[in-house]
């Protein structure tokens, strides 16, 4: 019998609960759904389990508040922490969420030190740095989910603007998960044609592209303001799970993720969003793209915005 993969989800809120359902519905492995509020974790796990006869899910799902239950997990997705409310920035969450991540990291180090860890908690680039600091896991095994989601939003807005299938659009977003993120127009394409060339072909204006870039930067905020309570969870859940899937199944997808840089892009000792290849060894390669001077300036502004917050951890 082939042993199923074990996927632990730390935080049973909207994103954690959605990921638990997606893992089960796609038969990606057994699930441990952990939350400090054990009742929420157990209730959602039971609800998902009871859907299996109808949805034909296989595998086990456990709801718990005991970190010992994550022992031996192959992959862990961390969504624990408070989420944004209308009027809040991602950075407003730092003080509370750093303490949450510290506790999570120490328990991951104790019970699942060989796991591949994806951090979703905001402010993302600071929380993934805290995870690395307090867990002492190798840097190639700790990543943050940012660019996959940001690229998905950018791709969706471009597809809607051009009235094409989202399957035709591919995009790359660099930098921090915030106002200084950098969607790269020349490396983003529709049907293999770069968006920069689409502008030259008069299929979309540069002004409209700039508006879409700004809309992408504000994508999470727009959803927060519409929901009033809580933040986005469908797209973040899909994005985090894609990263875990690439690791567990050695798909070697090139994805934009917040990873620890050791001189790439001129950055040292920070987690910043860049394209990487994720395979069975975690982050297997950082892809260094050629940037224009303007792009370098925006990227460096993004790096500086992250570095200013590092003292908080």
Curated annotation (Swiss-Prot):
It holds the Pfam family Ldh_1_N. The keyword Signal does not apply. CDD domains: LDH-like_MDH (cd01339). The active site is at 177 (proton acceptor). Gene3D superfamilies: Lactate dehydrogenase/glycoside hydrolase, family 4, C-terminal (3.90.110.10), NAD(P)-binding Rossmann-like Domain (3.40.50.720). NAD(+) binds at residues 11-16, 35, 97, 120-122. One of its GO terms (biological process) is tricarboxylic acid cycle. Substrate binds at residues 84, 90, 122, 153. Catalyzes the reversible oxidation of malate to oxaloacetate. HAMAP family: Malate_dehydrog_3 (MF_00487). PANTHER family: L-2-HYDROXYCARBOXYLATE DEHYDROGENASE (NAD(P)(+)), L-LACTATE DEHYDROGENASE. This is Malate dehydrogenase. The gene is mdh.
């Amino acid at each position: 019998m082939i042993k199923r993969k074990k996927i632990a989800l730390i935080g049973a809120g909207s994103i954690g609960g959605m990921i638990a359902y997606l893992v089960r519905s796609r038969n990606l492995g057994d699930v441990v759904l952990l939350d400090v509020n054990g009742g929420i974790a157990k209730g959602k796990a039971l609800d998902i389990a009871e859907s299996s006869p109808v949805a034909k899910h296989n595998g086990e799902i456990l709801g718990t508040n005991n970190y010992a239950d994550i022992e031996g997990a192959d992959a862990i997705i961390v969504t624990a922490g408070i989420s944004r409310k209308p009027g809040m920035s991602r950075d407003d969450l730092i003080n509370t969420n750093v303490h949450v991540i510290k506790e999570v990291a120490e328990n991951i180090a104790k019970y699942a030190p060989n796991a591949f860890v994806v951090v979703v908690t905001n402010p993302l680039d600071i929380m993934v740095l805290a995870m690395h600091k307090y867990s002492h896991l190798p840097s190639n095994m700790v990543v943050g989910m940012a660019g996959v989601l940001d690229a998905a939003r950018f791709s969706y807005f471009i597809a809607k603007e051009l009235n094409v299938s989202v399957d035709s659009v591919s995009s790359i977003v660099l930098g921090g998960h915030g106002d200084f993120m950098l969607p790269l127009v020349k490396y983003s394409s529709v049907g293999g044609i770069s968006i920069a060339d689409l502008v030259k072909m008069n299929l979309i204006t540069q002004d409209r592209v700039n508006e879409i870039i700004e809309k992408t930067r504000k994508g999470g905020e727009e959803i927060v303001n519409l929901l009033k309570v809580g933040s986005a969870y469908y797209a973040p859940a899909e994005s985090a799970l894609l990263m875990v899937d690439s690791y567990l199944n050695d798909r070697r997808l090139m994805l934009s993720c917040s990873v620890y840089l050791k001189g790439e892009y001129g950055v040292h000792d920070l987690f910043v969003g860049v394209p990487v290849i994720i395979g069975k060894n975690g982050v297997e390669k950082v892809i260094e793209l050629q940037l224009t001077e303007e792009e370098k300036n925006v990227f460096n502004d993004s790096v500086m915005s992250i570095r200013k917050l590092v003292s908080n951890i």
